[in-house]
From Swiss-Prot:
It catalyses: L-glutamyl-tRNA(Gln) + L-glutamine + ATP + H2O = L-glutaminyl-tRNA(Gln) + L-glutamate + ADP + phosphate + H(+); L-aspartyl-tRNA(Asn) + L-glutamine + ATP + H2O = L-asparaginyl-tRNA(Asn) + L-glutamate + ADP + phosphate + 2 H(+). Its EC number is 6.3.5.-. The gene is gatC. One of its GO terms (biological process) is glutaminyl-tRNAGln biosynthesis via transamidation. This is Aspartyl/glutamyl-tRNA(Asn/Gln) amidotransferase subunit C.
């Protein structure tokens, strides 16, 4: 580890903002852990990545889905019968807005 970046006061402030109750032993442990994480991030920022092309994924991934196909349900009444709530021929769902 190079230089200390995170102080105990920083940890207390973040804990307060996040509404976390932590004791002094946790503050000391979190200070060391966060400092180690930031030291590692600092090491990564020193890497020369000018020749590395920007990517969104490390490996190529393709979406393996089928197209949606509209198909009638064999028995509409059976489906509506198991709905928690219904209104005529429709599912009734809670209002969200």
């Amino acid at each position: 580890m190079t230089t200390k970046v995170i102080t105990a006061e920083d940890v207390r402030k973040v804990a307060h903002l996040a509404r976390l109750a932590i004791d002094e032993s946790e503050i000391e442990a979190l200070t060391q852990q966060l400092d180690s994480i930031l030291d590692y991030v600092n090491q990564l920022s020193e890497l020369d990545v000018t020749e590395v092309p920007p990517t969104t994924r490390a490996i190529e991934v393709s979406n393996v889905t089928r197209p949606d196909v509209l198909a009638p349900w064999p028995n509409r009444e059976d489906l509506l019968a198991i709905a928690p709530e219904r209104e005529d021929d429709f599912f009734r769902v809670p209002k969200i807005m």
